[in-house]
């Protein structure tokens, strides 16, 4: 019986290489060499990195740095097969359908799931429309081809593992995948998927900025390695995974992964406290002319906005969930002050149109359900509103990236007679609160407060 297994990762970015690949590397280094990573991308916008990694045999150096400036260097060797991008993604599809592949994991960002506030597919999205016609521009079109081939080849069961910052990420992906297959008339694949796959929920955490320009020189000086594709991240790392794998899995708990019955308490704390605060700080910092997360966090007025949001609204909403939330808040905000990873506001500010409904709107809604006006939380969408107003005017200091940005709709919003009303009444962002008169009044107050902050 073959006991060599492949973990296929789709989305070969810095985060995967600083997080999941690090854990698999530690597992291999411990003497468990049954697993290896094969990795590739759906898009061809990172082929330079893939080619550099291929030339290095998949090896690269990870630099980690603490808030105190302590740096460590580790050569990561778990990625042992690089899948070059081709139109049609045949190398990726073949690897996914290989019987040795037992886990397919993916990091395609929050916007890469194309889900609306009701967790249904945004079928009007051009990439999704292309995939519904048989192309492979999204995770759904790509995995549909893999699952179809795996079914035809009788390649056996496997686990589909979402590693993105999406609430209930395994379930959301599963439902989106099934809806996609329904829309393409692939009932046989749906049946096969139900019998042969699971989609565990996960929570991932390690701040991973874009590699600094001087990183290769630092690695050469400190580790003596010429590396054309290094990555960097903070020292802190966490991975919580629902123990619901369909077939064999790596012994992840041996290297510090928390295998649990339910990920929900961890993901709620992380998404609301870390992810939402991170974006809040990036939007606010940008608006007052700052470039980096650490300098934005260390600005008293911005720190206070994030701290109030968590303390006054998030912690009461989450209640006693088994996690020490005040301590978690303090640890998160301390991590954001790390000046050595040089994390940019540009990176963290991205994908706001996915983040508001996923990370911020639930706290707004739950505050109203508790009979509390969400004064502190409302500052977050107000910051994003003014941030996007600067985008509309062309005065942002960098290019804003958003996988589901409808540029025409945003320009029309700011050209309307009452832009704040258009924003607050957007069901895609705020769900049922779009019909709440007090929420509109609150947004007017907070947008005015943001103007005061930046002027």
UniProtKB/Swiss-Prot annotation:
Pfam families linked: Mannitol_dh, Mannitol_dh_C
Pathway linked to the protein: Carbohydrate metabolism; D-arabinitol metabolism
Domain of life assignment: Bacteria
Reaction(s) catalysed (UniProt annotation): D-arabinitol + NAD(+) = D-xylulose + NADH + H(+)
SUPFAM superfamilies registered for this protein in UniProt: 6-phosphogluconate dehydrogenase C-terminal domain-like (SSF48179), NAD(P)-binding Rossmann-fold domains (SSF51735)
GO molecular function: D-arabinitol 4-dehydrogenase activity; fructuronate reductase activity
EC number from the UniProt entry: 1.1.1.11
Nucleotide-binding recorded as keyword: no
GO biological process: arabitol metabolic process; D-glucuronate catabolic process
Record carries keyword NAD: yes
Keywords: NAD, Oxidoreductase
Subunit-structure text: Monomer.
Homology family: Belongs to the mannitol dehydrogenase family.
Protein name stated in the entry: D-arabinitol 4-dehydrogenase
Phylogenetic classification of the source organism: Bacteria, Pseudomonadati, Pseudomonadota, Gammaproteobacteria, Enterobacterales
């Amino acid at each position: 019986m073959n006991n060599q297994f492949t973990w296929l990762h789709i989305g070969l970015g810095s985060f995967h290489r600083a997080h999941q690949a690090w854990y698999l590397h530690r597992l291999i280094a411990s003497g468990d060499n049954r697993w290896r990573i094969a990795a590739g991308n759906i898009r061809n916008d990172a082929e330079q990195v893939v080619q550099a990694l291929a030339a290095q045999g998949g090896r690269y150096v990870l630099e980690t740095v603490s808030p105190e400036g302590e740096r460590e260097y580790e050569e990561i060797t778990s990625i042992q097969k690089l899948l070059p991008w081709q139109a049609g993604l045949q190398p990726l599809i073949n690897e996914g359908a290989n019987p040795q592949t037992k886990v397919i994991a993916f990091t395609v960002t929050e916007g890469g799931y194309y889900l609306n506030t009701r967790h249904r597919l945004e079928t009007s999205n051009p990439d999704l429309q292309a995939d519904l016609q048989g192309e492979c521009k999204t995770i759904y079109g790509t995995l549909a081809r893999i699952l179809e081939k795996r079914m035809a080849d009788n390649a056996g069961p496997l686990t589909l593992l979402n590693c993105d910052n999406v609430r209930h990420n395994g379930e959301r992906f599963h439902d989106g995948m099934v809806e996609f297959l329904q829309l393409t008339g692939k009932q046989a694949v749906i049946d096969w998927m139900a019998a042969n796959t699971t989609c565990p929920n996960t929570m991932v955490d390690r701040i991973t900025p874009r590699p600094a320009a001087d990183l290769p020189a630092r690695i050469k000086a400190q580790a003596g390695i010429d590396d054309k594709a290094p990555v960097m991240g903070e020292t802190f790392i966490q991975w919580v995974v629902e123990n619901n794998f369909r077939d064999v899995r790596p012994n992840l708990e041996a290297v510090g992964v928390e295998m649990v019955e339910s990920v929900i308490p961890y993901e709620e704390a992380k998404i609301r406290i870390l992810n939402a605060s991170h974006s809040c700080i990036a939007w606010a910092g940008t608006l007052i002319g700052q470039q980096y997360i650490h300098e934005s966090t260390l600005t008293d007025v911005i720190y206070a906005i994030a701290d109030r949001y968590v303390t006054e609204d998030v912690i009461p909403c989450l209640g006693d969930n088994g996690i020490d939330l005040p301590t978690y808040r303090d640890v998160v905000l301390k991590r954001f002050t790390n000046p050595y990873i040089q994390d940019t506001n540009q990176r963290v500010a991205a994908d706001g149109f996915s983040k508001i409904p996923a990370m911020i709107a639930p706290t707004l809604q739950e505050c109203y359900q508790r009979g509390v006006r969400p004064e502190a939380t409302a500052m977050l969408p107000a910051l994003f509103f003014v941030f996007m107003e600067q985008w509309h005017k062309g005065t942002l200091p960098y290019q804003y990236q958003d996988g589901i940005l409808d540029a025409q709709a945003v320009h029309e919003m700011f050209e309307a007679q009452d832009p704040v009303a258009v924003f607050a009444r957007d069901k895609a962002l705020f769900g049922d609160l779009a019909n709440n008169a007090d929420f509109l009044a609150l947004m007017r107050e907070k947008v005015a407060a943001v103007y005061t902050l930046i002027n």
